[in-house]
Amino acid sequence: MVTFFATNAPALVSPGLDLEQSFSQTLEGFGLSDQAARLIWLPLPMLLVLVAAVVGVLVTVWLERKISAAVQQRIGPEYAGALGVLQPLADGLKLLVKEDIIPARADGLLFTLGPVLVVVPVILSWLIVPFGQNLLISNVGVGIFLWISLSSVQPIGLLMSGYASNNKYSLLGGLRAAAQSISYEIPLALAVLAVVMMSNSLSTVDIVSQQTGAGILSWNIWRQPVGFLIFWICALAECERLPFDLPEAEEELVAGYQTEYAGMKFALFYLGSYINLVLSALLVSVLYLGGWGFPVPVEWLAGWLGQSVDAPLVQVITGATGIVMTVLKAYLLVFIAILLRWTTPRVRIDQLLDLGWKFLLPLALVNLLVTAALKLAFPVAFGG
Amino acid sequence: MFGFLKQVGDYTRDAVDAARNLTQGLAVTFDHMKRRPVTVQYPYEKLIPSERYRGRIHYEFDKCIACEVCVRVCPINLPVVDWVMNKETKKKELRNYSIDFGVCIFCGNCVEYCPTNCLSMTEEYELAAFDRHSLNFDNVALGRLPTSVTTDPAVQPLRELAYLPAGEVQPHGVDPSRPRAGQRPDQVLSSLKQNAGGSAGNEGESATSTNTSKGSAE
């Protein structure tokens, strides 16, 4: 779609569907200038991704409630819409009309700024999530690095809201969130670095393209099993999901940094945490599970069926399967995250930091070194 | 050197063990997903309170002799017995009687000691109110009988404790239409009636008739 930076897509992958080009061509057919067509096009993918993110959150909340219920031999939401699908919508509506409370001796400005600072980077990170060769807002050259740097803005917001609440539980929750995010960012970045080293690019599109050669066999999970585990554990810690939900541990800290929040500000935290979960799942599928790639390469399928990859219908089907595959993989991971939530007990803060600094960090370093060695030894298999 | 290697080996073994345990745990939670729900869908389904359930207290004004035993045995002297001495008949005349269920602990001592059995326990437990003073029941309110779970047409009565049908051990894939184990009070009554009819005709067949009635109930 919109490409601010030059894409260096490998020549062997077909350019696929380019909606922006077709759209601009249509508008230019109406006599608009190139610039005007671009200006009209710009907000469309952004809006689309924003809506997709919010719908993704609604689905995730519903899934979380239904799967949690099933794991505990309950039924879960049932009466709001068929099978309770409208329950998250009802929850959101409730939060929207609730009173907006700022505690008496809290810092009003920071208290308001906190949730915004938590949500904005997470939504901004959707910029780099590809659903197809050209189906992303911006193929930024530094793609995955942008996500890592954006996700380190989040703890500042958490710390801010925890400190501004003028509440000891909030402060402790905020501090824990900051400590957790900082200690898990490093192994996360190292795990990503190993993938980046193999695909020779930080761009998410290139990372996926590099995994599309032989379908499921070329997915990074086979070449980076340790990296996959490190990334998934760190992603769970970054999302503050159980077993790493210390910042909001109900039994100890009421609700952590969210304690004093109500109404729309609380909804922002809630939205942020679930968007972050979906985003992390999407990025795991992009980095390790072949992104939009079908288990069998679409090019092969088209070849067996005697169709050209460039035929319009094939392109549309390829695009659709791309979106479905990305979402499917992401939601499989979301399911695992929800199941893990009811399987694992919460770790203690010392165990959390131990795991981060003494286990994941050395392991990620070793993984990086081994990847580098393998890349030098077998450049064919490890993207030399 | 070997010490270091041993450390690394132990560490690896621990990590592998942790992974195995985690997988085992995930298998357990995954296995729970397709089981029959244990929950009672409350406003639509209700558990039948047990026989000697201590719910809201029922009181019969006409039986009461204003002896105030209930007040004496009550841990906090809760019942308010408002009576006056009629000088002419030399008898107590009861005016009002009330119990505040916002304070009552439902110990049942008053019911136990009432000499005329004018106090009794009901199976009513839905005592939520917007104002705690509305829980102070006077003799009129105390005389009302609650709607029974088994006769309320809006409620599906459920037997307590067992959530699986009789004879079922595996909670997986149980048909949702099959009821829980145990008979509902009306089924118990009908089987008793059948039993009585069978025993009047033939003493020897009473056992089989019990069996058939049980079978039909399930």
From Swiss-Prot, chain B:
- The UniProt record lists the 4Fe-4S ferredoxin-type domain at 55-84, 95-124
Q: According to Swiss-Prot or TrEMBL, what is its membrane topology?
A: Peripheral membrane protein
Q: Can the keyword Manganese be found in this entry's annotation?
A: no
* SUPFAM superfamilies hit by this protein: 4Fe-4S ferredoxins
Which residues does the annotation say bind [4Fe-4S] cluster 1? C64, C67, C70, C114
Cofactor binding summary note: Binds 2 [4Fe-4S] clusters per subunit.
Keyword field contains Metal-binding? yes
Q: Where in the cell is it found?
A: Cellular thylakoid membrane
Q: Name one GO biological process term.
A: photosynthesis, light reaction
The UniProt regions of compositional bias labelled Polar residues, in chain numbering, are 208-218
One Pfam family assigned to this protein is: Fer4_7
Query: Which GO terms fall under molecular function for this chain's record?
Result: 4 iron, 4 sulfur cluster binding; iron ion binding; NADH dehydrogenase (ubiquinone) activity; quinone binding
Q: Which PROSITE patterns match?
A: 4FE4S_FER_1 (PS00198), 4FE4S_FER_2 (PS51379)
Function summary:
NDH-1 shuttles electrons from an unknown electron donor, via FMN and iron-sulfur (Fe-S) centers, to quinones in the respiratory and/or the photosynthetic chain. The immediate electron acceptor for the enzyme in this species is believed to be plastoquinone. Couples the redox reaction to proton translocation, and thus conserves the redox energy in a proton gradient.
What is this protein identified as? Answer: NAD(P)H-quinone oxidoreductase subunit I
Gene encoding this chain?
ndhI
